[in-house]
């Protein structure tokens, strides 16, 4: 398997001096792609058997920002994220019912109907959160032959064995098993609570292929039995197919570090393939200090949270926390995020409003402040994608711009630089200002309509004042106040905010 070809037109050699935290090395290290100008990223995607929850949102937004930042710094990024639609069993191990099949029985649907239903549900949620679509979105069921081929390679090299129609990875044959998580093989043996199945040589061996029971609906022919692939093999096979040997970044949630990512490495490397060069993991969400999980019943779906909060407020809350930090989700955190996002978006709207009739020229002092904040933002993103510091830079810029805007007219050139900085850093990198036409831009499209309507309302109020119809002008102001809109009279005319 080879690295995808880069054309001469798109190949670049940026050198932004990025450092990232590599889980394998357990420290921050310089990021040097295997191919200059190109980054291959693989993210473990969802198992599509139910609606996505906020834990999925944390992971997807975190790696979306990393992808956006790499693009901002000049890299061509191929971003692959899989869809698990077979092989993920209820206990995340080798026994139990397939999660999709269990849901299919509950909803009285075919497993593939369940997969399609929640596949599209997942992407509606991601679109709302302004998460860019992956370059490639491979589904496990569409890559059965690639998985079988990798299993055959492992058997041939003596790292896997067939037993009663199933195939297992022989962990004792691969001494490096456990190097990502730091778990020693002997410690794993002492700590295991799984009884050794007759068909397993060792309780720590994991399934590469499972023989299907008669009631199992999802099944394919293989050299060993009619069955289905194990959960771990799909990611090894598909990442190598679409990103090639030694691709750059493999990402996922911290909960996947063991056993899933550990198994991926063992499968790929034992078969003779050079696997991922950097490993990145996002941390978890907590609610009331407890880890959010379905087993605890304290999880919230993305759809439910979007009924209460603007999608960009949810995204703002997520990027305000470092991807390697725990993010606490509560009403206070959402209220703070709503205020913070409102401050940024209102400043951008005010800049765009002022541009309509801004005087020519620029403000050298303010231009210097804008440039300094851009540098500050980019330095934060170079340092292991430190989004909290990057957001703080945007707030610093916001304060400086509002001070200048309140002091009087600002030159067009400077306003354009400020607008471009907001759109580039807050929009293109952090994804907080959605592109026109995307699902996430709907609320912002609505905001544009509100801006236009408010211009008309303020002009009507000004006409009342000019005609000395002060009662009518005050009534308009009071009505707006009841709707949560504050009108401020300044020397440059009336301004409004929510």
UniProtKB/Swiss-Prot annotation:
This is Cysteine--tRNA ligase. ATP binds at residue 294. Its main location: cytoplasm. InterPro entries: Cys-tRNA-ligase (IPR015803), Cys-tRNA-synt_Ia_DALR (IPR015273), Cys-tRNA/MSH_ligase (IPR024909), CysS_C (IPR056411), Rossmann-like_a/b/a_fold (IPR014729), tRNA-synt_1_cat_dom (IPR032678), tRNAsynth_Ia_anticodon-bd (IPR009080). It is found in: Cytoplasm. PANTHER family: CYSTEINE--TRNA LIGASE, CYTOPLASMIC, CYSTEINYL-TRNA SYNTHETASE. It is an enzyme of class 6 (ligase).
């Amino acid at each position: 398997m080879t690295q995808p070809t880069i054309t001469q037109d798109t190949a670049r050699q940026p050198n932004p001096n990025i450092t990232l935290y590599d889980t394998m090395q357990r420290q921050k290290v310089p990021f040097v792609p295997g191919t200059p100008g190109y980054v291959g990223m693989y993210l473990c995607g969802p198992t599509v058997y139910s609606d996505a929850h906020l834990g999925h949102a944390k992971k997807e937004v975190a790696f979306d920002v990393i992808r956006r930042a790499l693009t901002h710094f000049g890299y061509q990024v191929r971003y692959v994220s899989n869809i698990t639609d077979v092989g993920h069993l209820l206990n995340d191990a080798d026994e139990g019912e397939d999660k999709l099949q269990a849901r299919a029985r509950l909803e009285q649907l075919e497993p593939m109907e369940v997969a399609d239903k929640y596949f599209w549900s997942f992407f509606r949620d991601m679109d709302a959160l302004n998460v860019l679509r992956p370059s490639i979105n491979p589904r496990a069921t569409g890559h059965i032959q690639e998985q079988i081929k990798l299993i055959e390679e492992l058997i041939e090299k003596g790292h896997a064995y067939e037993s009663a129609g199933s195939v297992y990875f022989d962990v004792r044959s691969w001494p490096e098993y456990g190097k990502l998580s730091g778990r020693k093989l002997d410690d794993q043996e002492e700590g295991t609570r799984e009884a050794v199945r007759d068909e397993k040589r060792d309780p720590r061996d994991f399934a590469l292929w499972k023989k299907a029971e008669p009631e199992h609906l999802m099944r394919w022919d293989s050299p060993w039995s009619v069955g289905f692939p194990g959960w771990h093999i799909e990611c090894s096979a598909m990442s190598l197919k679409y990103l090639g040997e030694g691709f750059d970044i493999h990402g996922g949630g911290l909960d996947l570090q063991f056993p899933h990512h550990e198994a991926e490495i063992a499968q790929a490397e034992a078969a003779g393939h050079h696997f991922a060069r950097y490993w990145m993991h996002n941390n978890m969400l907590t609610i009331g200090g407890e880890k959010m999980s379905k087993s605890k019943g304290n999880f919230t779906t993305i759809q439910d949270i979007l009924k209460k909060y603007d999608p960009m407020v949810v995204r703002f809350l997520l990027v305000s926390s470092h991807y390697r930090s725990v993010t606490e989700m509560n009403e206070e955190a959402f209220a703070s995020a709503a205020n913070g996002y409102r401050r940024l978006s209102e400043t951008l709207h005010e800049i765009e409003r002022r541009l309509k009739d801004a005087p020519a020229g620029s403000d050298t002092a303010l231009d210097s402040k804008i440039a300094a904040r851009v540098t500050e933002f980019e330095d934060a993103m170079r340092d292991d994608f430190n989004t909290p510091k990057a957001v703080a830079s945007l707030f610093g810029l916001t304060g400086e711009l509002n001070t200048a805007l309140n002091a009087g007219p600002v030159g067009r050139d400077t306003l354009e630089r400020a607008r471009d900085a907001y759109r580039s850093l807050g929009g293109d990198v952090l994804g907080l200002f959605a592109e026109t036409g995307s699902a996430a831009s709907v609320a912002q499209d609505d905001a544009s309509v509100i801006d236009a309507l408010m211009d008309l309302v303020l002009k009507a109020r000004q006409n009342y004042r000019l005609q000395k119809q002060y009662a009518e002008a005050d009534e308009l102001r009071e009505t707006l106040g009841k709707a949560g809109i504050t009108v401020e009279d300044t020397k440059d005319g009336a301004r409004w905010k929510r």
